[in-house]
């Protein structure tokens, strides 16, 4: 526990942190990667270049300082970050490196004096221990469950299937022929790659897209413009190639009773965790209402449409609605979408009348903010809305 003086000293730095903003974490990362370049093998350098990770870390530091005397308020954020850390295989000793550079950053940018640095050192130590302990629990859970493993494990690509102009699915089975760990629908795999020509090892998280079967995994990858890893997977990864995987993780998952109605809302590749949820509901014969609401630019980039239709047909109470923002003439001729333009949930207001319905959202942050606001305006309780950000987390 932190003493009152330490808490007061840390909280007194909040105005300075807010005034500085993400410049603080930009300095921190630049310093850390200069002195410890080996960490470039772990961090997603694309998120460093676009600033997303720097903003996310700043928000986390500011939130910690603001809630330093109320750590339980931070536990949901801690769980989300700890789950993600396990896919990077973060180790306790790396927290010492981060702490060293965080304190050096505070000193170099603000010269706050030893009392402030000591207070932040104590505060960081408490938070680091929270993460270290939780991550140790997750590592142990992953290693001890049936089909589980420690560290990375070699998997072979056994199928590669284009699903749209932008999305391709990959089916993976363990090289050792053993069983694989189950997971909760909505969770992701950590994929580790360092093909020839890559300056650093790259680690990405891709949502699992079907119900666990104990034999292998399926992910789906969107080709991102300028995306080093996604383009390599689309252009160069082939059936028979071997990749390294970390056991499934993630705090975004569906866990509902059979009599709980569910609405799955997504756009683009945001449908990937929803597919695992829908597959799970379908194979369990879920008896309550299931809604599938999806938005795409047009039919060319709309993936898994046939699979969703087939899964929906196996559910006793299923409703699907698809929006195309800019449908082609071919899309109109085929009649493969329901509405044109942006997703407007107000036209489906009657679908949300059950107060026990659980809502799962995934897509770009702007889409989820837009959609969550519609749901709240329609009377849905915030606690019934669950969402996943691809990349560093942001609060809706």
Curated annotation (Swiss-Prot):
Q: Which CDD domains match?
A: flavohem_like_fad_nad_binding, HmpEc-globin-like
- Locate the active site: 95 (charge relay system), 135 (charge relay system)
PROSITE patterns membership:
FAD_FR (PS51384), GLOBIN (PS01033)
Chain residues that bind NADP(+): 268-273
Q: Which cofactor does it need?
A: heme b; FAD
The free-text cofactor remark is: Binds 1 heme b (iron(II)-protoporphyrin IX) group per subunit. Binds 1 FAD per subunit.
Single GO MF descriptor: heme binding
Keyword terms of this UniProt record:
Detoxification, FAD, Flavoprotein, Heme, Iron, Metal-binding, NAD, NADP, Oxidoreductase, Oxygen transport, Transport
Annotated segments matching region Reductase = 147-396
**Which parts of the sequence are marked as the site Influences the redox potential of the prosthetic heme and FAD groups?**
84, 388
Q: What's an example GO BP annotation here?
A: nitric oxide catabolic process
- Catalytic activity, as annotated: 2 nitric oxide + NADPH + 2 O2 = 2 nitrate + NADP(+) + H(+); 2 nitric oxide + NADH + 2 O2 = 2 nitrate + NAD(+) + H(+)
| Segments forming domain Globin | 1-136
**Domain of life of the organism encoding this protein:** Bacteria
E.C. number, please?
1.14.12.17
Q: Where is the FAD-binding FR-type domain?
A: 150-255
Q: Give the binding site residues for heme b.
A: 85
What's this protein's family per the entry? Belongs to the globin family. Two-domain flavohemoproteins subfamily. In the C-terminal section; belongs to the flavoprotein pyridine nucleotide cytochrome reductase family.
Q: Domain annotation text?
A: Consists of two distinct domains; an N-terminal heme-containing oxygen-binding domain and a C-terminal reductase domain with binding sites for FAD and NAD(P)H.
Protein role: Is involved in NO detoxification in an aerobic process, termed nitric oxide dioxygenase (NOD) reaction that utilizes O(2) and NAD(P)H to convert NO to nitrate, which protects the bacterium from various noxious nitrogen compounds. Therefore, plays a central role in the inducible response to nitrosative stress.
Q: What is this protein called?
A: Flavohemoprotein
> What species was this sequence derived from?
Shigella flexneri
């Amino acid at each position: 526990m932190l003493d009152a003086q330490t808490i007061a000293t840390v909280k007194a730095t909040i105005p300075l942190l807010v005034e500085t903003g993400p410049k603080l974490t930009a300095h921190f990362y630049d310093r850390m990667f200069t002195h410890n370049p080996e960490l470039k093998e772990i961090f997603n350098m694309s998120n460093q270049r676009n600033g997303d990770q720097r903003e996310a870390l700043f928000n986390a530091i500011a939130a910690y300082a603001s809630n330093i005397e109320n750590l339980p308020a931070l536990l949901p954020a801690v769980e989300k970050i700890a789950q993600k850390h396990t896919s990077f295989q973060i180790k306790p000793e790396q927290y010492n490196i981060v702490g060293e550079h965080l304190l050096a950053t505070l000193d170099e940018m603000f010269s706050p004096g030893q009392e402030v640095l000591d207070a932040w050192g104590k505060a960081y130590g408490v938070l680091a221990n929270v993460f270290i302990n939780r991550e140790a629990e997750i590592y142990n859970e992953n290693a001890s469950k049936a089909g589980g493993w420690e560290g990375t494990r070699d998997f072979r690509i056994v199928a590669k299937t284009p699903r749209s102009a932008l999305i391709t699915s990959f089916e993976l089975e363990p090289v050792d022929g053993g069983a694989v760990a189950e997971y909760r629908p909505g969770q992701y795999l950590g994929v580790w790659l360092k093909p020839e020509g890559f300056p650093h090892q790259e680690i990405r998280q891709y949502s699992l897209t079907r119900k666990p079967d104990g034999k292998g995994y399926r992910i789906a990858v969107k080709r991102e413009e300028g995306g080093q890893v996604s383009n390599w997977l689309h252009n160069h990864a082939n059936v028979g190639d071997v990749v390294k995987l970390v056991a499934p993780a993630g705090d975004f998952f569906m866990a509902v009773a059979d009599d709980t109605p569910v609405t799955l809302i997504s756009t683009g590749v945001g449908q990937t965790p929803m597919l695992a949820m829908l597959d799970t509901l379908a194979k369990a014969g879920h008896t309550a209402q299931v809604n599938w609401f999806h938005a795409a630019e047009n039919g060319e980039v709309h993936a898994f449409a046939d699979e969703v239709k087939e899964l929906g047909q196996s559910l006793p109470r299923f409703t699907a609605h698809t929006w195309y923002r800019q449908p082609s003439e071919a899309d109109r001729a085929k009649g493969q979408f329901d509405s044109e333009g942006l997703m407007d949930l107000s036209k489906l207001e009657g679908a949300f009348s059950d107060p026990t319905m659980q809502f799962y959202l995934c897509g770009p942050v702007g889409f989820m903010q837009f959609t969550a606001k519609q749901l709240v305006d329609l009377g849905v309780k915030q606690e019934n809305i669950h969402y996943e950000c691809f990349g560093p987390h942001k609060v809706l």
